C-alpha cells in the first residue's frame, strides 16, 4: 500500500464524537486487535501550576497533577487497580507535561462495566487526609528513586540550566519540598478545575465495532458541528546567552556528552506540529548510528562515537532538545555534524529522504501495535490534526527547512554536561 494511502486509511478508521457533557470520544478501529485499549486523557499535566479564575490566580506546587493521579486510584476506600483486575482489565496511569492519563486494556465485552467505574472515580472523588499523607510518602520515595537515574537527572538539569523558571525543568512528580507543601485545599481546587468532562478525551482503540457498541448507554454521543482546527504555535527563542557547561570528572577524558538546546520557531515556520516533526526527521538523520549521514561523517572524520540519541521536548510554552553522544569524540559531534552539512549541501535531499522514510515507516510500523498507535492518535488530538496532515508535513519538508534546523543547532542557547570516562563507568 502507498504510504499516503495508509495515513488516509488511519483517518478513515477514526471517528470523533462528543458526549452531551462535553467529553471528547476518539474511536480508532483496529480490526486485528483482540483486546481494546481505553485511555482517558485529562487536560492537566505537570506544567499546569497556575489555576486562573475570575477571582484571581492560584499558584499550585509542582507535582500537583501527578499527585492527583495517585489519589484518584483510590475510590470509596478501594483501589481501582484491584477493581479492574476483577474485570480482567489492567489499569495504569501516568502524568506527562501536558496531561494526565488513565489507561487500561480489556476484552470488548467488559468495557461497558469498566468505563463507568473509571469515569465515576474521576468525576466523584472524595478527598481523605489519611490517604493524602500516605501518598506523600509514596511520591517522596518515587522522587528520590528518580534522582538515582542519571539519564533523568541530566535531562532535567540541562533544562534547568537553559530555563530555570520553566515547569519543564521539574520532574513531573515535583520536588520533595513541593510534596511537603501540598495541602488538601490545593488538591481540591486543582481537581475541581481539571477533572471536568470538557477537559477529558476518551480514546477507544481496537476492534471494528461502532463506538456506541463499546460505551455504556448513558453516554449520549453527538458530532461537533463546524469544528475549526486550532493552530498551535511555538514562539521564537530569546537571543542566546552564554552557554553553560558542567563537567563531571576529568575534563581531559570526556566519554559522555549531554547537550541541551533551547529551540523555538525558525524563519518562516512557527507551527508546533510542523516543528515537532521536522526535529524528529532531523534527529533521525543526525543521531541514528545507521543513518547514511552518520556513516559518511564517521568515515570522513574517523569519529569514535559509540552512542547517539536525541529527545525533543516541544510545546507551546517552549522547546528543548536533549542530545546524547558517547565516545572519545562525543564532545565534538554536534559542531562537526553542523559543519559537514554546510559543506555537503548537495547531499541534503538524500539525507532528508532517509529521515522522512524513517519517520513514516515508524508510524506505519507503530500502527500495528495498539499502545503505539494510541500515542500517535494522542499527538493528533493534542495538535488538532489528522494522520494525513502529519504525512503532508513530513512529505513537504525541504532542504531549506533542514538547513534552518542546522542553523538552530549552531546558534541556539546551549547547556552541556560532560561526563568523564571514570564517572561514566561508575554509573
UniProtKB/Swiss-Prot annotation:
Pfam families to which the protein is assigned, alphabetical: Peptidase_M16 (PF00675)
Keywords: Antibiotic biosynthesis, Bacteriocin biosynthesis, Hydrolase, Metal-binding, Metalloprotease, Protease, Zinc
Amino acids binding Zn(2+): 66, 70, 142
EC number: 3.4.24.-
Active site: 69
Protease found in the keyword field: yes
Superkingdom of source: Bacteria
Cofactor: Zn(2+)
GO biological process, alphabetically ordered: bacteriocin biosynthetic process; proteolysis
A GO term, aspect molecular function: metal ion binding
Broadest EC class assigned to this enzyme: hydrolase
The keyword Mitochondrion is assigned to this record: no
Database matches in InterPro entries: Metalloenz_LuxS/M16, MPP/UQCRC_Complex, Pept_M16_N
Note on cofactor: Divalent metal cations. Binds Zn(2+).
Family: Belongs to the peptidase M16 family.
Function per UniProt: Required for production of the bacteriocin subtilosin. Could catalyze some step in the processing of presubtilosin.
Protein name: Putative zinc protease AlbF
Organism per entry: Bacillus subtilis
Gene: albF
